A protein has these predicted regions:
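Positively charged n-region of N-terminal signal peptides that target proteins for export
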Residues: 1-4
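Bacterial N-terminal signal peptides
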Residues: 8-16
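Short, low-complexity N-terminal intrinsically disordered segments enriched in polar/charged residues
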Residues: 21-65
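Short beta-strand edge/turn micro-motifs at domain boundaries
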Residues: 23-31, 139-167
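Sec/Tat-exported extracytoplasmic proteins
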Residues: 47-50, 54, 58, 66-70, ...
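Hydrophobic pocket/interface hotspot
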Residues: 50, 62, 70, 81, ...
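A mature extracytoplasmic/lumenal domain signature
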Residues: 66, 76-78, 117, 124-128, ...
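Surface-exposed, charged secondary-structure patches
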Residues: 71, 87-135
Length: 167
């Protein structure tokens, strides 16, 4: 009986607190800031997955960050849809070549993210390092347009570019 009284009192307290906030429809500045930080973290994970996928030759991980109808402009080609993008990574991307065992890295200070609601842009560089020599063997830049689709941030459009190896 005592547990039931405590439970009822706790429920009443929650209702009172929620009513004092104006209900769940009210979004506070703290809520907005927290959501923004969560979105920025999730967007940053796209770069992490991108580089993990190239280092490990994990095509499924790579494709998990692309939207179904994504467009990728790379090497004077326009690839449309996950099938064409997947094919390019498997057949033309040097980091995915079976004979290359490169580590893929990005200088964190070169990552640029602009967030606007459920859309964002992100730029990062890919520095491919031969672990045997410690030398950068290839570098590229990429600008992604991202969208939050069904609660998940995905690449909808991307364009490859040359990277600047200086700060």
């Amino acid at each position: 009986m005592r547990k039931l009284v405590y439970l009822a009192a706790f429920a009443a307290l929650l209702v009172a607190l929620q009513a004092g906030r104006g209900g769940s429809a009210t979004v506070t500045t703290a809520d907005s800031a927290t959501q923004r930080q969560a979105d920025l973290y999730q967007i940053d994970q796209i770069e992490v997955k991108f580089h993990r996928a190239t280092s490990r030759h994990d095509i499924d991980l790579m494709m998990s960050i692309w939207a179904p109808g994504a467009v990728f402009n790379i090497d004077q080609q326009t690839l449309t849809g996950k099938a064409q993008i997947r094919h390019w990574f498997l057949t033309e991307n040097k980091a995915f070549m079976p004979t290359h065992h490169w580590e893929s890295d990005t200088p964190s200070y070169k990552i640029k993210i602009a967030l606007n609601g459920d859309k964002a842009t992100m730029y990062f560089e890919c520095h491919y390092i031969d672990p045997k020599t410690g030398m950068v063997v290839a570098a590229a830049g990429v600008t992604h347009t991202l969208q939050k689709i069904n609660g998940q941030w995905l690449i909808t459009n991307s364009a490859g570019s040359t990277a600047t190896l200086s700060p």
